């Protein structure tokens, strides 16, 4: 019986295999491939060349990696004054907010700085408050962390850390019945200033409408104790309006203070919308004028915030009123919203406009004007200039035109600090 081959293997027999001749017809080319022969360009070993694109050209013309990691990289004029906005919030409820301009950004305070740590330690040990912390001043890292301890500055706030008024721009705590005055505060303040060894100090106060004298005698006692511990110490006081009681303003003026400062904060038109209802533009002018009348040699000073919606005519009017009341020094700074509970910023004023108003104030006859986005009531260039003027007066030098002539030199000193 013949052996039968399995059916499944029949397909593998040689009789069933057919040789298919290789086609000599050329393969069909793809539509994107050119039929013309391409000449190959020799490439550099280890490097592939890519054709340039508009995207790569844009990247090459833009900022480099160093521009992103270097915070001090210079900006173009267009970028420097550009106001940027951003959309925040959940979908359907997004709102547009304005980002902080480049010229208003400041370094974060660091405890690594020895001067910063020492000043903070002294203040805590003596139970003293500063307006630097309470008002969230943007210059605290510069003032508390000066190049040397003598160059560091802290503005001490007297009569506690709670104010009886509620201005719409201010971050200081408010209460109708703040804690009573600390009877040891004058001595503690004088001792802290003696430890620091500063030549020029700034003291500010909260408004205390709950006190019969608005705290005038407490302030005067503090200044006198400071002078007792260091007779050459120059003291600037940034005080309130004492509820319109001009006699209390004169009590402070007679205490031995060297610079009598009281801020009008804004223009007369905007005062009812910016300051507490008990603070009035004319009342502030009366306080400054009465201090000058009590002591004609006293330097009087005030400060204004820009960016609240004021017009040029509003500012001209305010400056004319200040000169009519013999105010010597004026400063301009940008209003910066402390929290969302406070009034919003109307606009961010450019550094060029601040410089313009500085020149205008000097042309009107002010002894000194500090003007800039980050300038506050206590400003180092202003302190350096006023300190120089006061020392010359003590030596019997004239302080009129010579003081103004030394303005630029004093500003350089302030920048160096």
Swiss-Prot record:
One of its GO terms (cellular component) is mitochondrion. Binds 2 [4Fe-4S] clusters per subunit. One cluster is coordinated with 3 cysteines and an exchangeable S-adenosyl-L-methionine. Keywords: 4Fe-4S, Iron, Iron-sulfur, Metal-binding, Mitochondrion, S-adenosyl-L-methionine, Transferase, Transit peptide. It is found in: Mitochondrion. It is an enzyme of class 2 (transferase). Its main location: mitochondrion. Transmembrane segments: none annotated. Signal peptide: none annotated. It catalyses: [[Fe-S] cluster scaffold protein carrying a second [4Fe-4S](2+) cluster] + N(6)-octanoyl-L-lysyl-[protein] + 2 oxidized [2Fe-2S]-[ferredoxin] + 2 S-adenosyl-L-methionine + 4 H(+) = [[Fe-S] cluster scaffold protein] + N(6)-[(R)-dihydrolipoyl]-L-lysyl-[protein] + 4 Fe(3+) + 2 hydrogen sulfide + 2 5'-deoxyadenosine + 2 L-methionine + 2 reduced [2Fe-2S]-[ferredoxin]. InterPro entries: Aldolase_TIM, Elp3/MiaA/NifB-like_rSAM, LIAS_N, Lipoyl_synth, rSAM. Pathway: Protein modification; protein lipoylation via endogenous pathway; protein N(6)-(lipoyl)lysine from octanoyl-[acyl-carrier-protein]: step 2/2. Residues 1-30 form a transit peptide. [4Fe-4S] cluster 2 binds at residues 163, 167, 170. SUPFAM superfamilies: Radical SAM enzymes (SSF102114). Its cofactor is [4Fe-4S] cluster. Its EC number is 2.8.1.8. [4Fe-4S] cluster 1 binds at residues 132, 137, 143, 378. Residues 23-62 are annotated as: Disordered. It comes from the Eukaryota. Belongs to the radical SAM superfamily. Lipoyl synthase family. NCBIfam families: lipA (TIGR00510), PRK05481.1 (NF004019), PRK12928.1 (NF009544). This is Lipoyl synthase, mitochondrial. It comes from Pyrenophora tritici-repentis (strain Pt-1C-BFP). The lineage of its organism: Eukaryota, Fungi, Dikarya, Ascomycota, Pezizomycotina.
């Amino acid at each position: 019986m013949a052996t039968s081959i399995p059916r499944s293997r029949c397909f593998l027999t040689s009789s069933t295999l057919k040789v298919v001749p290789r086609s000599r017809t050329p393969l069909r080319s793809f539509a994107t491939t050119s039929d013309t022969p391409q000449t190959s360009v020799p490439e550099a070993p280890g490097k592939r060349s890519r054709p340039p694109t508009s995207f790569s050209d844009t990247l090459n013309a833009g900022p480099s990696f160093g521009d992103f990691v270097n915070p001090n990289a210079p900006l173009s004029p267009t970028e420097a004054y550009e106001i940027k906005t951003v959309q925040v919030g959940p979908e359907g409820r997004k709102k547009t907010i304005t980002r902080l301009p480049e010229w208003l950004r400041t370094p974060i305070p660091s405890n690594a700085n020895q001067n910063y740590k020492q000043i903070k330690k002294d203040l805590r040990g003596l139970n003293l408050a500063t307006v630097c912390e309470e008002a969230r001043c943007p210059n605290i890292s510069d003032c508390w962390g000066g190049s040397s301890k003598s160059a560091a500055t802290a503005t001490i706030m007297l009569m506690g850390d709670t104010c009886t008024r509620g201005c719409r721009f201010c971050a200081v705590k408010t209460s109708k019945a703040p804690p009573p005055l600390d009877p040891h505060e004058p001595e503690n303040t004088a001792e802290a200033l003696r430890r620091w060894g500063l030549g020029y100090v700034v003291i500010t106060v909260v408004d205390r409408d709950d006190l019969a004298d608005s705290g005038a005698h407490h302030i005067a006692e503090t200044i006198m104790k400071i002078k007792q511990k260091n007779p050459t110490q120059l003291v600037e006081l940034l005080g309130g309006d004492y509820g319109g009681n001009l006699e209390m303003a004169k009590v402070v003026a007679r205490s031995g203070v060297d610079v009598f400062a009281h801020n009008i904060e804004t223009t007369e038109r905007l005062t009812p919308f910016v300051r507490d209802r008990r603070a009035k533009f004319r009342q502030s002018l009366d306080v400054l004028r009465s201090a000058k009348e009590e002591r004609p040699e006293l330097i009087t000073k005030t400060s204004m915030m820009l960016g609240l919606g004021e017009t040029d005519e509003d500012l001209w009017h305010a400056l004319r009123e200040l000169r009519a009341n013999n105010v010597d020094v004026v400063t301009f700074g940008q209003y910066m919203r402390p929290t969302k509970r406070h009034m919003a910023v109307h606009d961010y004023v450019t550094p060029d406009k601040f410089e313009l108003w500085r020149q205008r104030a000097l042309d009107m006859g002010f002894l000194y004007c500090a003007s800039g986005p980050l300038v506050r009531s206590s400003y180092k260039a202003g302190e350096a200039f006023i300190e120089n003027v006061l020392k010359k007066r003590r030596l019997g030098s004239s302080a009129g035109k010579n003081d103004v002539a030394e303005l630029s030199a004093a500003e350089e000193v302030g920048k160096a600090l």
